[in-house]
Amino acid sequence: MNFDSLSIKEAAVNETVSLSAELLDPMQLGERAANCESSAELLAMLRDAIAQASAILDERYKQNLSITDIVHGRASVIDQVLRIAWGRQQWPDQFSIALVAVGGYGRGELLPHSDIDLLILTRKEKHTAYKEAISGFLTLCWDIGLEIGQSVRSVKQCQQEAAKDITVATAL
């Protein structure tokens, strides 16, 4: 391996790590969310975090930062926001449900103004026990200002849909 190419790769990785740290500190965001006393306060805090990160990403774009780093940075910010929104819900059985990023967002590529494609994956086909928590999660996401494209399916339903539709298979 050429040392010059290694240095270039290390610099690119360091720049991406530096950008992620600059955009959002997950620990700090989690602590701030835990200290929110109302839903309105949580919404304002999450909206502000997204707006601040977007402003940094916009500035980095103007400074010719790699587009790849920018779209990965944007996805990383949304990852943190979704973790908080998901964690605020009262899940009847948190081990039988999962939030899965799919599509471009699932690849870590989130362009400005893109929708955020999510699969809410359940162990069983009947997910009525989760209806209220899913509704609360999606409502919180929409209130934050996120454009969510979502589906709620069991593993078996995902397999059936993927067998029928190649676009579902590639999105998964």
Question: Which sequence ranges carry the predicted segments?
Answer:
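N-terminal regions immediately upstream of nucleotidyltransferase
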Residues: 1-95, 113
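Short, functional N-terminal and low-complexity linear motifs
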Residues: 43-53, 102-108, 153-156, 172
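Preference for short coil/turn "hinge" residues that link or interrupt alpha-helices
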Residues: 63-64, 70, 98, 103-106, ...
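Surface-exposed loop/turn and secondary-structure junction residues enriched for glycine/proline
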Residues: 64, 108, 113, 169-171
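Conserved catalytic core of two-metal-ion nucleotidyltransferases
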Residues: 68, 75-83, 89-91, 131-172
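Active-site nucleotide-donor binding segment shared across nucleotidyl transfer reactions
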Residues: 79, 83-131
